[in-house]
Amino acid sequence: MSAAEQLARDERARLGLGDEAPVADLVRVLERDGGVCIALCHLGEQGLAGLYQTREGVPVIMINSSPHPVRVRFTIAHEYGHHRLGHGVAVDRVIDTSSRDRREVGANQFAAELLLPGVGLDRWLRSRGDAQPDLETVARLANHYGVSCEVALHRLERLRRVRPAVRRALQARIEAGEHRDLAWQLGLSELEDTVTEERRLGVRLPAVTRRAVLRAVEDGLIDGETAAERLHVDRLEVQRMRRHGRAID
């Protein structure tokens, strides 16, 4: 196990995530207990993947929410890895799991262990009795942990749970898109969390910003229309946020 993976394992313990369960809502966990502010915004499929920086002493992670949610979650975990590994400012145009750059390798290993912990993977495989994973195993594993099939297969390879020849064959099938058809046939439903919820809004500001804006509405300092403009949502969404306390999450 690398130092980055051990740090991720320790971080799961610190965040109260245990050593095997999926992360139910990564954004809320990291904003509540990870000490970072996270902003999501649509930048297009070819836009910046994510960045990490500290602004006025506050760690900020900005993520392109245009890609599929499984990619967005990994990018969030990757940027959080830069934060916890002390890498300083990081600007990632793409998240390349095959990168050999030292910082990128560390952030990728951290993200993979945070989202799909080795202990959990082993126990999950044993519960299924899969001696050698096939495409269905990879699809179900990815779905269980809310990651992509590429990440799930990479974890199986990293932890030596799949033979090289089998991995290459599975990689080719994933690149051909067969996993998507299989997921549909198996009736696998996507993880519902802040990432999937906020995609329809286009922009998600950090919780601390949303709290400040809604508090200003409650105090009569600004009206609903102004709040909607500052939060990049419509007035109906502002009403829903106030009613359900979403700015506090």
Stretches with model-predicted labels:
Residues 1-249:
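Active-site hotspot residues in diverse enzymes, especially metal/ion-binding acidic/histidine motifs
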